[in-house]
Amino acid sequence: MCDDDETTALVCDNGSGLVKAGFAGDDAPRAVFPSIVGRPRHQGVMVGMGQKDSYVGDEAQSKRGILTLKYPIEHGIITNWDDMEKIWHHTFYNELRVAPEEHPTLLTEAPLNPKANREKMTQIMFETFNVPAMYVAIQAVLSLYASGRTTGIVLDSGDGVTHNVPIYEGYALPHAIMRLDLAGRDLTDYLMKILTERGYSFVTTAEREIVRDIKEKLCYVALDFENEMATAASSSSLEKSYELPDGQVITIGNERFRCPETLFQPSFIGMESAGIHETAYNSIMKCDIDIRKDLYANNVLSGGTTMYPGIADRMQKEITALAPSTMKIKIIAPPERKYSVWIGGSILASLSTFQQMWITKQEYDEAGPSIVHRKCF
């Protein structure tokens, strides 16, 4: 435990779906909870419960039946700052139980995050939470650090957004970053839709969470989609059952791999975009010809939506088909990749060489929020 150390840095990875927070130097986040803020749908139904006007994270999740749930981060980018402040407040005071004014804080951001957004993050940290120092790091770069590399291409796919980010010697190459607004939340929505075709109805925000659980427990990526569809049609070997909270048991078959197949064929949900294998290839092709070999050999997967069984083999197969025939292609899928952004942040914030990189309160007071563009890149 490093709580005795007065100035341990905090690392907070704000994902669209989950907040991962903890102390620099730890090997895993202390707190992982949903990035949701829930407000009661009806006034005063819980008599004597000391009605609150809002609930955050797990508490919102457990009371979801009587709440309307909102996600303040959409597609990796913060859209609702009031709710975001509630989430940060909950992170510091309830989850980590620290006083933010005593700890330098490392936050993460999506690649290609709008400039105004990072300024606003900086402003809230210094003015609302009075942190002594802070830094904003790009999520994909942290994932690459966590895998022990400084060069490679990261496929980071979370709940709200998917990116292909080529990184050379620790610097993201912005001209070659590919962003795809298709990630875990869209897969959950799609699974809700195709389960409806089976006659199961999932509509409310609370029921969506059940579908998300089905997705996480039962879905996988097929190595060959057409073959798998044929297998599913001819036998019931791929069927699995799932028990709903009310005891009803539902059966799911080809939905198990049709759902994540959307990552490779976005046309399934009506998106006119290339799949994640093609965006990875396009991203590499936008990079200097001299570094492509290093990128092909270091394809790092990161984020919860890369946790499907079979995804690494499928990526290997698809990229091999696109790349030059002699190219060595390697997909790295670390087992802890759900949290690799946080782990990379924990590593970075505890390096002695990083300590002069923090934006201090003094620098912020002198230069204002725009300091973040000069110090964090």
From Swiss-Prot:
- N-acetylaspartate: residues carrying this PTM: D3
In alphabetical order, the GO MF annotations are: ATP binding; hydrolase activity
Which SUPFAM superfamilies would you find in this protein's record? Actin-like ATPase domain
Its name, as the record gives it, is: Actin, alpha skeletal muscle 2
- Mind listing the UniProt keywords for this protein, alphabetically? Acetylation, ATP-binding, Cytoplasm, Cytoskeleton, Hydrolase, Methylation, Muscle protein, Nucleotide-binding, Oxidation
Q: Which residues carry this modification: Methionine (R)-sulfoxide?
A: M46, M49
Looking up PROSITE patterns in the UniProt record yields: ACTINS_1, ACTINS_2, ACTINS_ACT_LIKE
Q: Signal peptide position in this chain? A: none
Q: Sum up the protein's function in the record's words.
A: Actins are highly conserved proteins that are involved in various types of cell motility.
Looking at the UniProt record for this protein, which Gene Ontology cellular component terms does it annotate, in alphabetical order?
actin cytoskeleton; cytoplasm
Q: Which SMART domains match?
A: ACTIN
Proregion residues excised on maturation? 1-2
Q: Which family does it belong to?
A: Belongs to the actin family.
- Additional facts recorded: Xenopus contains at least three sarcomeric alpha actin genes that are preferentially expressed in either heart or skeletal muscle. Due to the tetraploid nature of Xenopus laevis, each of these three alpha actin genes is present in at least two copies. The cardiac versus skeletal expression patterns of actins are probably sequence-dependent. For example, cardiac actins contain a Glu at position 3 of the mature peptide, whereas skeletal actins contain an Asp at this position.
EC number from the UniProt entry:
3.6.4.-
Protein encoded by which gene = act2
